[in-house]
């Protein structure tokens, strides 16, 4: 059998998290319409009859000089070098622009281990032929047989990509037991679900100005309930007010939806105490950036 690590790369909102969740059959990475909601190198594990793929979902690659974005770029580059293979996902509903060309430049020395998924091929706005032409000029050593038109959301073309990726991996025993689909710890998964729900409940500048943190987590009732005290952090008092909402309606909804999502993931109930705090200009603080993006 073959087994190894596959790094997923692409522009923000190219469908990387959706692909990972669909391929693994479980919720591993948070999904939203807001670009760059993945801040960490998240592992998802897929087992097939031919072997095991350990996927790393990297942050959406986006050139920017902001501290947080620079850290996310660093994570993406490091994971590319570490992977046994690379899956490059492209959103066919968007123009093939400078960000795609920047990613292609990173992949030039990695063409022998790269597979490309043209995502959202089911949409009428798909520009598959034009994108393929661009790719073949920028990455001439990637054979056309390694370029797939897929829909991560509808689970179309996923199995074909998985089969090819398995072939690119080295021969060896599985890296993880077959019943494991992610190596994320409990606290990390809780913070990601809370952050996802906060993003889905907000708009404008708030999704990029927030992060979640778990203060306490204790098991009760003989392992049947996990009690969690967590906080959502924003940069301004005005953002805090919006996140709480009139009559605390917004934060209450975030808490309830988070508990419902967590119940789907864990074999026990999660009781969540969720509050909002202000951490002024946290996106400029190295210790916070290091804490939430690793």
UniProtKB/Swiss-Prot annotation:
Residues 36-40 are annotated as: G2. Residues 119-122 are annotated as: G4. Residues 10-17 are annotated as: G1. One of its GO terms (cellular component) is cytosol. Keywords: Cell inner membrane, Cell membrane, Cytoplasm, GTP-binding, Membrane, Nucleotide-binding, Ribosome biogenesis, RNA-binding, rRNA-binding. GTP binds at residues 10-17, 57-61, 119-122. InterPro entries: G_ERA_dom (IPR030388), GTP-bd (IPR006073), GTPase_Era-like (IPR005662), KH_dom-like_a/b (IPR015946), KH_dom_type_2 (IPR004044), KH_sf_prok-type (IPR009019), P-loop_NTPase (IPR027417), Small_GTP-bd (IPR005225). It is found in: Cytoplasm; Cell inner membrane. It comes from the Bacteria. Residues 57-60 are annotated as: G3. Residues 202-280 form the KH type-2 domain. The keyword S-adenosyl-L-methionine does not apply. Residues 2-171 form the Era-type G domain. One of its GO terms (biological process) is ribosomal small subunit assembly. It is a peripheral membrane protein. Residues 150-152 are annotated as: G5. One of its GO terms (molecular function) is GTPase activity. HAMAP family: GTPase_Era. Belongs to the TRAFAC class TrmE-Era-EngA-EngB-Septin-like GTPase superfamily. Era GTPase family. An essential GTPase that binds both GDP and GTP, with rapid nucleotide exchange. Plays a role in 16S rRNA processing and 30S ribosomal subunit biogenesis and possibly also in cell cycle regulation and energy metabolism. Monomer. This is GTPase Era. The gene is era.
